[in-house]
Amino acid sequence: MKRTREKVKEKVMAALELPSAPAEELAAALREVKLHRLYADPDIAGLLRKRDEVRDVRELLDDADIFVALDRSFTDRITAIGARFDSRSDELYHTMLVHEQQLRSTCGLPTYEHFNTSIVVEFLDEGHYKNPLDFGASVDYAMSYFSLTLRSFLEAGERMSVHYDSAKFDAACLHLPLSGEWAIFHERRSIWEHGQARGTRHENVAVFDASGSELLSAFRVSLSRLRGVRQGESFNPMTHPAVAGSTRKLPIDGFRSNDEVKSAYMTTQQFYSEDLREEVRGARLCEWIRAYTVVKEIAKQHIASHPLIGQPATLLLHKTADFFLAEFVAAGIPVKSAGQILRRFTFNASSKDILDAPLIPFNGELVLVPTAAMLIEPAFSLESLLKSIRSGKDEPNHELQFIGPGFEKLTRRVLADAGIVARKVKHKNRDCDVAFVLEDDVLFLCECKGRFQTSDFRSYVELEAELGRDAAQQHRKTCDYFESHLAHVRDRLGLAPTWVPSRVMRVILTSAKLGRVRFNEDFYVIDENMFYAFFARKKLSMRPLSSRRRTFVHDPRLDGPITVDAFIAYMDDPPSISRTRMLLEERELHFELEGRMITFKDVECYGELLKEHKESAVWTFPGTTVHHYS
């Protein structure tokens, strides 16, 4: 990353040093300045100030000054809190206590009642919340900040004896107001850096408006769809046979609980895998699920065994690495796999949060924040954990290596179940993942891109860019080749030697949930949810969280035979996106900076959980599920 940034810096400096750089070249340089946060670099900032007679440069500098000052104000607040502790280890210990106390209070669990400070959890956009899921999304913001704070403590590398001190607990509580603000600031800065918010200033007020950004709206819709599906699955009544039928091989020693059954089911869906014994990062999928399950069980047992918290230290669980290793092995995980899992579960500088890596190294032991561990959903934590692990120089991209083949296979099965012949077409170095024909003479050539779900704005921007640029370029060459060499398509699909398509439709299909339909020149870019729902004739439905009863929404495009026109109409306006877009609302978030009011205007999706007869319910958008095809 540093090498890339240095290369970009050299290129940008060369462009800015030109006395009369072309407008397009200057605009490109300014985009790189924002994307790589080079505006905070003294060398780049100095060159920009020499060109401040240019309007775009001046506006960038004015905006950047605000973000740099806001970042500094947050850093100063964090530093001021840290000054009240004897060491970083001291601060880490008391911050973990505060976080556990906060989570217990939120979840209605036993707390230590003798703290001087009462913990109140508030978020900047609470006025918009419609249900607990909206609150939960903001808790994710807080968890991000807490994990960011942890990483800074761990990097200090200190080991010393620490003990509870009420004044230090009070000081650690000051991190809480920062939690949501810090994470929200980071996201708003990222939105601006990607050119999706324009700043305006008037006297002591600065406004950054991203409410009209289609890209931001798409990200919000994508994330809302993801939250809705995950929330819906977590309440989905499920039994052992339901999952046993969805996998070709059972996990180690069967299932320990219904919770593990759900985790196994959701893992098969997220990883497009029919075999939970597939290996990833040194352990099988079922072993990762079992290890997360064991950590949750240890956390639950710790909380249950302490109905009254007599001492603050009891809030946390301190154990050696050997303890957790032994627990994993006792649960049926081979020693070698258990060692790999323990290494990945240990929180470090690259960890995203403690839901993925729940074991925090502290003074030679591993500390578990029990209530946070209870919130772990193994399927989602494993996906997030894998995203945080960067592949080595000679290692294949895990998403491509692991998700891709299963995703392609299931896409072809969706079509086969609809009575449509679908095949992979290969010749020499050309490879079309899925080819099929509708109405006898309309050929569809599909490129499948297996990707993890995106949960932050930058990742979503990169996803859309990859699909619309890199994937399109690759698929264009593939389509051009096979359209010129139809014999290979005829052979794989069993078509007559003289068969010629009346037209060819090019489709890029991704496993990640999108927030809008993209039509890139001659390509449709859609996600598997839209594809599966159409060909499986699955209509949008709403299900109360407490039952299996569903209310279906009529969709004439899903009635009658499968036609080309109906499929195109569905791709143009999929209900999974159009319905979610109805939840978009504009909002304003405010920060104060040295007597100035900084306002961020954007959009957010609220209310994935709907109210029906006073009963919480969730929209159910059909999506490819492995158990349908086993």
Where are these regions (language model features)?
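Acidic, metal-dependent phosphodiester-chemistry machinery of nucleic-acid enzymes
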Residues: 1-401, 409, 417, 462, ...
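A short acidic/basic microdomain associated with nuclease active sites
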Residues: 408-430
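Short, flexible loop/turn elements at secondary-structure junctions
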Residues: 419, 426, 438, 450, ...
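Hydrophobic anchor at the start of a short beta-strand
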Residues: 421-422, 443, 504
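Catalytic metal-binding acidic patch
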Residues: 429-437
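Active-site beta-strand-loop-beta-strand hairpin of nuclease catalytic cores
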Residues: 436-455
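Mg2+/Mn2+-dependent nuclease catalytic core
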Residues: 451-485
